[in-house]
Amino acid sequence: MPRGKRRAADTISDNMDHGQPKRARTSYTSIPTQQSSRRHIRLEDGFSQKRCMAWFQEYTTPDEPETLGPDGMEKFCEDIGVEPENIVMLVLAYKMGATQMGFFSQQEWLKGLTELDCDSAAKMVVKLDYLRSILNDPNSFKSIYRYAYDFAKDSDQRCMDILTAKAMLQLLLGKHWPLYPQFAQFLEQSKYKAINKDQWCNILEFSRTISIDLSNYDIDGAWPVMLDEFVEWLRLQRSQVTSTTGSS
């Protein structure tokens, strides 16, 4: 999942993939941790809440012992061998019921990892394929897609800013929706600075039901104006290509 924004006291610098903010990196060695809870843990060992919480504390700081923040998140991702932007991290956040991108609370951590029977990095690595497989179920994917909207947008904003929306759409639909490249191009040149939840949910429905040639799109249907404009724009682009090809 795209990296979370730091809280107000943290610094933000550079640009992350898809044009989103990326915070300045902090050395992992500067993060106080407890002695590793991963020593001598075998995969066949039963789940231990105590061990799970000790693992959580490896990624927190004395200032915020009940919150795993961006620095801890990077270390956690490193330990389980995935990039923070990997979609499996979004699925994990969904399982935890996490409310803010880039952060896990102690309660969220315990809820999700108890359900997954994970109390160590080694056990989490084994669960990654299962978490990815959840995306193969259409209903589960829809739930995760809807969850991603509130999870990724700024909590004090009603809508998701367009940069975050494009990054999340790339993550969720980029590999599976044939028209995604054209839709991303449409957003680039459009007037839209944000996407509301109704638009967000309808983009998924559009990607699942409308054919590549747009022949089954009903302009009088109950689609958001944004998608009407996308269809009009794409048809114009295609007609221009056809005209250019025909005259050459």
UniProtKB/Swiss-Prot annotation:
UniProt main location, coarse: nucleus
GO biological process: one example? negative regulation of protein neddylation
Region ranges (Disordered): 1-35
What are the alphabetically sorted keywords of the record?
Nucleus, Ubl conjugation pathway
For bias kind Polar residues, which ranges apply?
A: 26-35
Read off the PROSITE patterns from this record. Answer: DCUN1
GO MF annotation list? cullin family protein binding; ubiquitin conjugating enzyme binding; ubiquitin-like protein binding
Where, subcellularly, is it found? Nucleus
- UniProt key word Thylakoid: no
Q: Return the GO cellular component terms, semicolon-separated.
A: nucleus; ubiquitin ligase complex
Q: Where is the signal peptide?
A: none
Top-rank taxon of the source lineage equals Eukaryota
Domain DCUN1: start-end pairs: 47-235
The function of this protein is: Inhibits neddylation of cullin components of SCF-type E3 ubiquitin ligase complexes and thus regulates SCF-type complex activity. Essential for development. Function inhibits cell proliferation and cell growth.
PANTHER family to which the protein is assigned, alphabetical: DEFECTIVE IN CULLIN NEDDYLATION PROTEIN, RP42 RELATED
* Protein name (Swiss-Prot/TrEMBL): DCN1-like protein 4
Q: Which organism is it from?
A: Drosophila melanogaster (Fruit fly)
